[in-house]
Swiss-Prot record:
Originating organism: Homo sapiens (Human)
Gene from which this protein is expressed: LDLRAD2
InterPro entries the record matches: LDL_receptor-like_sf (IPR036055), LDrepeatLR_classA_rpt (IPR002172), LRAD2/Mig-13-like (IPR042333), Sperma_CUB_dom_sf (IPR035914)
Region: Disordered, residue numbers: 202-272
Protein name: Low-density lipoprotein receptor class A domain-containing protein 2
Localization (cell): Membrane
Length: 272
């Protein structure tokens, strides 16, 4: 029998009557804890859930949305993954009485992550739904808002990802740091202790000029949330999705170097 731990979170309406979190420097947060909220700041290390890289997020029927807002007017948002795993062992069954052909999107039957362009009042899908085990290419918004929506469907969903959020601008940098590729990022993100590639070309973490990062920095704990360094204000935000109570179920993630699909197949066989 599969062992799991369940934690019930307070009920939230996704991005509706949500709290806006404002940050001024780099921090960590968990998507599962920010459902229905709008986060604003310089940079963010975003995990799927608090136990990322140790346990899967396996809550079925999850519909969790988050808006990320750039730090300043004229900025955009860039998101790149460090690690990505989103799928379901068994896809959701097809709807009854449907005569239309199966969708070409391979994520359609199961769990997926979808990005959106803003504004929140009129979200537009940005790219195709993402699923599988391969790290997707980075995405960037054309305006100050980038939305994320995690949907789990089917039998035994498996979710675990870590991504880097960066507020950036193009053109004159002003007080921002100019990357070698021409992007401008907040100076607070240069030589950050997580080693995040906020520029996208590594120049904000280089030991050479203009970053001049001096040796490795102590890596802070990644178990914190945004609560300690943010101010909250209530803002009405339209929903990317809707859900009732959100449950987090945890199962141990596969060890490094092992194929999680093989591990799940073995686990599934042992329970039947």
């Amino acid at each position: 029998m599969e062992a799991c731990c369940l934690l019930q979170l307070p009920q939230r309406l996704l991005l509706l009557g949500a709290a806006a979190l404002t940050a001024t420097a780099l921090e960590t947060a968990d998507l599962a804890e920010l459902c229905g909220q709008t986060w604003q700041g310089d940079g963010l290390l975003l995990r799927s859930h608090a136990a990322s890289r140790r346990f899967y997020f396996v809550a079925p029927d999850t519909d969790c949305g988050l808006w990320v807002q750039a730090a300043a007017p004229g900025d955009r948002i860039r998101f790149q993954f460090r690690f990505f795993l989103v799928y379901s062992l068994t896809p959701a069954p097809p709807a009854l009485n449907t005569s239309s052909p199966a969708p070409a999107d391979p994520c359609a039957p199961g769990s997926y992550l979808q990005f959106y362009e803003g504004p929140p009042g009129a979200p537009r899908p940005l790219g195709s739904p993402l699923c599988g085990l391969n790290i997707p290419v980075p995405v960037a918004s054309s305006g100050p808002f980038l939305g994320l929506r995690l949907v789990t469907r089917g039998r035994q969903p498996r979710v675990d990802f870590v991504g880097e959020v960066t507020s950036f601008r193009l053109g004159p940098c002003g007080a921002y740091f100019r990357c070698q590729n021409g992007r401008c990022i907040p100076s607070s993100l240069v030589c950050d202790p997580w080693g995040m590639d906020n520029c996208g070309d590594g120049s904000d973490q280089g030991s050479w000029s203009p970053a001049d990062c001096r040796g490795p920095s102590p890596v802070p704990s990644q178990t914190g949330s945004t609560d300690a360094h943010t101010s909250r204000s209530l803002t009405p935000s339209p929903a990317l999705g809707s859900a009732g109570s959100l449950w987090i179920a945890a199962e141990r993630s596969s060890p490094a170097g092992r194929d999680p699909t093989r591990q799940d197949a073995a686990l599934e066989g042992s329970t039947e």
